[in-house]
C-alpha cells in the first residue's frame, strides 16, 4: 500500500477537498473509507483516511497508484498554499502493512500486545507496542469482508512482524494468502477494486459508492457539483453484482447483453466463489437493467450465458 502523511493547520482542509466522504465526521482514532474524485467525473483512487488529530492524517492508497496519487495530493496542497516539503510526506517506502483477516484475527493478535485490541470497534486504530516492536499502527480494517486487522510498521521491522504474527496465529490455523486470494475475498464481499469497478472514467455515484460521497454543508470536495447533479438526474449506468445461471466464468471486459443480444454493459470482475461454488461477478449495466433479479447475459466467446442481478455480499 501507499502511505501519505498530511500535517499542519491546513491538513483538514486539504483532506476534505481531496476526498468525497465527510472528514468533519471523523474523530481521533477513527478510520474512514473514501475516494479521490478527479476533475472529469471519475475517481483517481479509493483510500482509507486515518485521523490522528485535526492537524495530522494518514492516507492509505493503492500501491499501484502511489505515483499518480502523490502527484494529485501535492497539486492540490499547493493550490491551498501548503508547503509540500513539510506538510506532506510520502512514507510509502518506509512503511509496510500486514493484513491479518478472519473472525479469530483479533483474538490471535491479542497475544502480541498488552493493549486491548480484541475489543476494538470496526474502523478504529491505535498506536501500540506490538510483537516486541515499540510502536505500530493497529487498525481494525480489511479488504476481505471477514473482519480482522491491518498492522502498519516500519519496513525494518517487517520480517520480525511476519514471524511473530504467524507464531501467534499457529494455534488458530493461520495461513499466508496472496493477492489472488484477497481479490476473490473482496469480490465475494462486494468491495470495489481500482482498475475494475472504479477508475478515472466512472463516478462514485455510478459505482455504488454514494454512501461515501457526502453532499453535506462544508464538504466542498473536488468536482462536487458534477456528482451532485449526477445523483439528482440519475446515472445512465450502474455498477451491479451478478450471478451466472449458466455454467461459465465472467471475466473483465466481457460484454453484457440483454435477451435480444443488444450490448448493455461490460464486466468489471468475475470468478467462481469458493464460498458458494457459484460463478459471480460485477459489471456496469445501462439504467433499467440494474434492478434486483433483472435477467442479463454475459457474452463468453460465442455463447450468451444467462445471469441475474443480485445483492452483495455474495456469501
Where are these regions (language model features)?
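A common structural microfeature
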Residues: 1-3, 12, 46, 56
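Short, glycine/charge-rich beta-strand/loop segments that flank catalytic centers
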Residues: 1-2, 29-40, 88-98
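Conserved phosphate/anionic-ligand binding catalytic regions in large, soluble enzymes, centered on
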Residues: 1-7, 142-147
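Short, surface-exposed helix-loop/turn micro-motifs enriched in polar/charged residues
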Residues: 3, 25-28, 176-179
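Internal amphipathic helical hairpin motif
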Residues: 9-43, 105-135
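Well-ordered mid-protein domain cores that form the structural environment of catalytic cofactors
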Residues: 21-55, 60-76
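Conserved, structured C-terminal
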Residues: 52-315
Amino acid at each position: 500500500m501507499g502511505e501519505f502523511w498530511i500535517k499542519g493547520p491546513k491538513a483538514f482542509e486539504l483532506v476534505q477537498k481531496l476526498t468525497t466522504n465527510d472528514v468533519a465526521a471523523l474523530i481521533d482514532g477513527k478510520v474512514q473509507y473514501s475516494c479521490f474524485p478527479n476533475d472529469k467525473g471519475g475517481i483517481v483512487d479509493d483510500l482509507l483516511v486515518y485521523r490522528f488529530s485535526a492537524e495530522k492524517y494518514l492516507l492509505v492508497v493503492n500501491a499501484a497508484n502511489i505515483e499518480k496519487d502523490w502527484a494529485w495530493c501535492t497539486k492540490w496542497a499547493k493550490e491551498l498554499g501548503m508547503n509540500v516539503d513539510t506538510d506532506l510526506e510520502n512514507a510509502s517506502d518506509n512503511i509496510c502493512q500486514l493484513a491479518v483477516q478472519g473472525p479469530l484475527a483479533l483474538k490471535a493478535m491479542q497475544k502480541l500486545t498488552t493493549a486491548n485490541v480484541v475489543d476494538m470497534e470496526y474502523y478504529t486504530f491505535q498506536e501500540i507496542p506490538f510483537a516486541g516492536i515499540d510502536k505500530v499502527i493497529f487498525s481494525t480494517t480489511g479488504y476481505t469482508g471477514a473482519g480482522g486487522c491491518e498492522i502498519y510498521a516500519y519496513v525494518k521491522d517487517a520480517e520480525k512482524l511476519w514471524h511473530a504474527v504467524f507464531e501467534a496465529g499457529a494455534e488458530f490455523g493461520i495461513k499466508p494468502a496472496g493477492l489472488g486470494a484477497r481479490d476473490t475475498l473482496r469480490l465475494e464481499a462486494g468491495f470495489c477494486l481500482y482498475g475494475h469497478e472504479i477508475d478515472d472514467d466512472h463516478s462514485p455515484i455510478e459505482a455504488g459508492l454514494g454512501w461515501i460521497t457526502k453532499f453535506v454543508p462544508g464538504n466542498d470536495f473536488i468536482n462536487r457539483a458534477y456528482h451532485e447533479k449526477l445523483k439528482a438526474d440519475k446515472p445512465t449506468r450502474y455498477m451491479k453484482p451478478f450471478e451466472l445461471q449458466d455454467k461459465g466464468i465472467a471475466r473483465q471486459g466481457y460484454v453484457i447483453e440483454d435477451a435480444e443480444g443488444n450490448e448493455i454493459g461490460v464486466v468489471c470482475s468475475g470468478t467462481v466463489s469458493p464460498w458458494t461454488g457459484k460463478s459471480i461477478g460485477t459489471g456496469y449495466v445501462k439504467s433499467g437493467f440494474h434492478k434486483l433479479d433483472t435477467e442479463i447475459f454475459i457474452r463468453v466467446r460465442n455463447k450468451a450465458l444467462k445471469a441475474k442481478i443480485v445483492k452483495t455480499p455474495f456469501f
